[in-house]
Amino acid sequence: MRGHDRINNCLPEELILEIFRRLESKPNRDACSLVCKRWLSLERFSRTTLRIGASFSPDDFISLLSRRFLYITSIHVDERISVSLPSLSPSPKRKRGRDSSSPSSSKRKKLTDKTHSGAENVESSSLTDTGLTALANGFPRIENLSLIWCPNVSSVGLCSLAQKCTSLKSLDLQGCYVGDQGLAAVGKFCKQLEELNLRFCEGLTDVGVIDLVVGCSKSLKSIGVAASAKITDLSLEAVGSHCKLLEVLYLDSEYIHDKGLIAVAQGCHRLKNLKLQCVSVTDVAFAAVGELCTSLERLALYSFQHFTDKGMRAIGKGSKKLKDLTLSDCYFVSCKGLEAIAHGCKELERVEINGCHNIGTRGIEAIGKSCPRLKELALLYCQRIGNSALQEIGKGCKSLEILHLVDCSGIGDIAMCSIAKGCRNLKKLHIRRCYEIGNKGIISIGKHCKSLTELSLRFCDKVGNKALIAIGKGCSLQQLNVSGCNQISDAGITAIARGCPQLTHLDISVLQNIGDMPLAELGEGCPMLKDLVLSHCHHITDNGLNHLVQKCKLLETCHMVYCPGITSAGVATVVSSCPHIKKVLIEKWKVTERTTRRAGSVISYLCMDL
């Protein structure tokens, strides 16, 4: 009977709350909260996480949220993310006039004036100590708090937060100009703190860090510091002396030397994850790390000027549990150092070599011979690595699932055939500007790697239609990027459309020989397509788009700049036919006023003024 909701009235509140708990995405929870007023009132009890971007008057916004959501344990404030507000100006067309002196008009005028004055004041769109105090009062049970680039938060607000939110376990202050007093308060009151991020906190010194470390010594497990000139070895010495449970350490600083890292190695024997960009640290410190940090599982080193094969040998000798190794721009590490790691750390599962110009074929061969558990390999800007390196990977690393190759001019089809035949569990293959890789290697991948779901072949000039035909026959791809592969034409993309019905992401930008026919095939064969990049495709027209969107109703993003065959009619077709569309990248002159009114929020314009 109309007006009577018999089923909903019989549902207990516990069951409705359980429904909300099982909904993972925020849009789904929002949709279910609109079932009725009862569901809307109950939905707030299921929320445990809030994410807030830069918006007008965030201090007031925090107060409003605290009154609605009562069980929040995680709050993420990121002021790098802007939140656009709906326009408060009156609509130009009105069916019924209103007196400008009416109460509602007066309220609207005040709100508009307040908005415009706030736009002139930078602080109005930034969280301040007042808002942080409101957050502390409204969410005293919070456990995880991220304040990313909140420049108007100071020690005053942080002190208030620390006193109220004593259950805090994770605190991220990246880019906040807080001082030592606030950090000391966190150390005094937040005795359960486990994770702390102090990246780009320029107002901090050793004094505040030491106070926090001493106060949270029994709980602290993770510390991150970057670009803080006044945080030195003294802070690390305190960490080594007090934080016996420390497992994760991220350091990016030219003011940290061997003394500080040695102190950490001597005191923090549970250290598992070490990520460093410290130009002043030398092999001496890594000798201590290798000898004392026997639980180390992840090591990432960036732009080291005094780290050599000697340090690598120390790690290989002592850190037998190492599973993840990243070396980026470490110019003084050679094949000998990587061989020492391979021989000593046989549990390696992931290796990334980026711009280390002295590492060549022999180092990667050693990984292939000694590390059978390897699952991911990334070789970026490695000009001295040749085919035989990946031949050894194919022979010895049968569990390899992910392979990244960027600007590796010495790797060609011989290497890819070896990978295809030996690493049949390969799931992701990303190749960019490897000009010796062509059809033969990719055909072999399609023939042998049946589990492949992601394939990226960007600017690989020798890859053509035959390669994609083999992939379409052998693999059920979900993501494909062939941007800049100029030998690929309609036949290759058609083969993918017919052979990969699970495809969700496709990038065919900068392909000069692609026309409308593949888009029609994609519409018929790939109904799950969500992301499409067509930019710089000169032969695609509105007709192709029309065929595509008739069946691809899940499309969320479409990039189509520099496509002369696409007009304002094609843009209108995309935004009107795809109910889930979130972003369309196009030249501004191709968007009509009607399309702007209908879907202005999803249109992104190519910047032409650069």
From Swiss-Prot:
Positions of the UniProt region annotated as Disordered: 88-125
The UniProt keyword set, sorted, is: Leucine-rich repeat, Repeat
Give one GO biological process term.
nucleotide-excision repair
**InterPro entries linked:** F-box-like_dom_sf, F-box_dom, Leu-rich_rpt, Leu-rich_rpt_Cys-con_subtyp, LRR_dom_sf
Q: Name one Pfam family in it.
A: LRR_6
Keyword Repeat carried by entry: yes
Q: Where is the F-box domain?
A: 5-52
Tell me the SUPFAM superfamilies matching this sequence. Answer: F-box domain, RNI-like
Question: LRR repeats: which residues?
Answer: 53-79, 124-149, 150-175, 178-200, 201-227, 228-253, 256-277, 278-303, 304-329, 330-355, 356-381, 382-407, 408-433, 434-459, 460-484, 485-510, 511-536, 537-562, 563-588
Q: Which PANTHER family match?
A: F-BOX PROTEIN YLR352W (PTHR13318:SF95), PARTNER OF PAIRED, ISOFORM B-RELATED (PTHR13318)
The molecule here is called: F-box/LRR-repeat protein 4
Originating organism:
Arabidopsis thaliana
Gene behind this protein: FBL4
